[in-house]
Swiss-Prot record:
Transit peptide as recorded in UniProt: 1-20
Family label: Belongs to the MGM101 family.
GO biological process, one term: recombinational repair
Annotated region (Disordered), positions in chain: 24-91
Keywords: DNA damage, DNA repair, DNA-binding, Mitochondrion, Mitochondrion nucleoid, Transit peptide
Comp. bias intervals (Low complexity): 24-79
Locations listed in the record: Mitochondrion matrix, Mitochondrion nucleoid
Annotated protein name in UniProt: Mitochondrial genome maintenance protein MGM101
Function (record text): Performs an essential function in the repair of oxidatively damaged mtDNA that is required for the maintenance of the mitochondrial genome. Binds to DNA.
Primary localization: mitochondrion
GO molecular function: DNA binding; single-stranded DNA binding
Organism from which the protein derives: Yarrowia lipolytica (strain CLIB 122 / E 150)
Primary gene name: MGM101
GO cellular component: mitochondrial chromosome; mitochondrial nucleoid
């Protein structure tokens, strides 16, 4: 049985469509197989972290600027009147307590504060400017007692150094006087000497040079302290302390009444020597009668 014309035409059209579709797919496949596949580009590390940081900063800014919505149903806060606010006493805020000076002592405090700027090595601040009070003068010029006076084996009368300090403390009070060096310490082969100034109540009252002998180099520090004590004794002469010890008549009278000169024998070399001592006392070592 022969096919009909319509059937033949339909078969031809169908075959033509298959050829057209195959021809269309072949160039695409050929281009895909001819060109190698290129991998997708990854973002650079710097751009990646830049984007991450940008996103984080954007999120933080958005969170910071985000406002919590207020419920529409909550009532609005009423303004507080100034009269209704609690009153706070601010009169004592940031105020340091004021120190009250004792009566008559404020001027002395500021006087001592100003002394920090005075160079006592060269200054003569207050020298002879004003007399001391009557009470201080009576203490300074009080007569000596017989029990306070000592005598050296060579026959020199003296007052122990601690007695001078007690007189100054009684007249001006502890801390009301002091000794200021006015020169460098000079050390010779046998003597240490230095000049000192006596300052009482913030003013210079006397200047004297002290001296002390020594026998070896190890005794220089002790001699320096003795030099200071000797200068204090000489400065106190201007204040009238133990002024009797500088009077020849008093010295002769005291030695005649309370002292005696005896022969002393050295306990080591047995040499004899005339020495002075107080009556009723014995000779000091290394001598004996």
């Amino acid at each position: 049985m022969r096919p009909t014309v319509a059937l033949v035409v339909a078969r031809g059209v169908r075959a033509m469509g298959y050829r057209t579709a195959a021809a269309a797919t072949k160039p695409a496949a050929a281009s895909a197989t001819s060109a190698p596949a290129t991998p997708a580009k990854k973002p650079a590390a710097s751009s990646y972290w830049r984007k991450a940081a940008s996103a984080a900063s954007t999120a933080s800014v958005s969170n910071a600027t985000k406002k919590t919505p207020v419920a529409a149903s909550s009532p609005a806060a009423e303004p507080i009147e100034a009269d209704d606010m609690p009153q706070v006493d601010t009169s004592t805020v940031d105020q340091a307590p004021t120190f009250q000076y004792p009566e008559g002592a404020q001027s002395n405090v500021f006087q001592h504060m100003n002394q920090r700027e005075i160079d006592w090595e060269q200054s003569f601040q207050g020298l002879g400017s004003q007399a001391f009070s009557k009470e201080a003068a009576q203490v300074l010029q009080a007569p000596l007692t017989v029990e306070d006076i000592e005598i050296t084996p060579d026959g020199l009368l003296y007052l122990p150094e601690i007695k001078y300090r007690r007189v100054l403390n009684a007249a001006f009070g502890p801390g009301g006087w002091g000794l200021a060096p006015r020169s460098d310490t000079v050390v010779t082969d046998k003597i240490v000497t230095r000049e000192y100034g006596l300052i009482c109540e913030g003013r210079l009252v006397s200047v004297a040079r002290g001296e002390q002998t020594y026998f070896n180099e190890d005794g220089v520090p002790t001699a320096s302290e003795g030099c200071k004590s000797n200068a204090m004794m000489r400065c106190c002469k201007d204040l009238g302390v133990a002024s009797e010890l500088w009077e020849p008549k008093f010295i002769r009278k005291f030695k005649a009444q309370h002292c005696e000169e005896v022969w002393g024998t050295h306990v080591v070399n047995k040499r004899k020597k005339k020495l002075w001592k107080l009556k009723g006392e014995t000779l000091a070592y290394p001598y004996q009668e």
